[in-house]
Amino acid sequence: MTPSNATVHPAINFYHDLVHTGALAQDTWDVLEPGMQERLLNFGGRPLCTVLRPMLQTEADYAWLGARTSLMLSVFRKTSNALMRDAGLRAQMALTPDEEALVRIPTGYDTNIPTARLDSFFLRHADGSRTLNFIEFNGESPASMGYSDVLAELFLETPLMRRFQERYNARPIMARPYAADALLRIYAQWKGNSSDKPRMAIVDWADVPTTPEFTILANYFRTRGMTVVICTPDELDFVGGKLYAKGEFVDFVYKRVLTTELLQRYGLDHPMIDALRAGAVCIANPFTCKLLHKKASFAFVSDERNAHLFTAEEQAAVQLHIPWTRTVAERNTLDKHGARIDLLPWASHQRESLVLKPNDEYGGKGVLIGWETDQRTWDSALEAAIEDPAIIQERAEIAYEDFPRLDARGSVEMGQRLVDCDPFLFDGDTMGGCLVRLSTVTLLNVTAGGGSVVPLFVIREK
């Protein structure tokens, strides 16, 4: 048996040895490639996974990640509650007037974050120590819970994983059961009873690259007793006090469409919003999730102005796991060492250690990597950010691992990848699985192109 403090590296080395054994690599790709096609594992028409190895974590790794994530969840839960109570604090999020109107509409249940995802870099060092840097809070019904589950099921069918499991127990952490439990819980609270099941509409634009995942999720939710229709925002109608999707009555919206895009298209005049105001529909994630989804939420939790909201343990966790972050503004503040700084001149001078992110974008849009940007472009972006809200964030230590793939000739190629390990969050207090993304470029985002998703397996030597 592997002791609980054993590192994951021997298991990774064993897997890589198997990759170079006989035809295991080609035989595995011959399962993965058609399997992804058959099981809707594509993103905008591209295969979801391009490598031969999943992410491996020891039991101790996963337990440690869960404990640290839970502590940060406490911080964000307190943040969300404080922002809902205090309009003065809420101003730090730079909500638009329409967003402010939406967050004031009662949801009918008690959490602002029924589902979410914390994006992070999780490093496991050879000496057994670990480093964890959270970099973004995805609060708007985050993608990949369905993708990652089905990809894990597919990997379990591959020759490589079968040989690997001769030495190691390997269990996936499935996110869909956690998601269904969370959605059923808020629906029961909204409805006032737990006997009825949601009549759900999964709502997003028709041309989004994650459309295949909607079918994956719909199929699973149906096994949990829900009725599900997939539709666009244009296919919703609010008539006679009831919401309809493609003509079918629904009382639950699983809102995958981003709030910003909905408001850009319709303003506040949309059937979903009308139904919410009338108490005729339960929506997840709620519009209140926007408070944490804003990039400014990371500035909020790391800003000395707000430290009084958190316990000493929580403040220490923020310092340890949240890179120093500030909303771009003409102000004095404290740097990560506690020294007082004039923010804008300091940010200009510290370009090579900072990233600039728009307050409300996704898929890497508008992100400037300071150490990959010339000074003139950087300074112009800082100046623009005074009017168009953005944050600056300290450069986080990035996780790298080698992953094998087949090249065009069918030969095994080992390549270093940047690794994003993003815990899925439920009910505002529970971690249930992770999205793991790989990239060869600094801007680690599948939406931006060139990335790969792999499933996570928690392992223990037999």
Regions found by a protein language model. Give the residues of each.
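Preference for protein termini
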Residues: 1-462
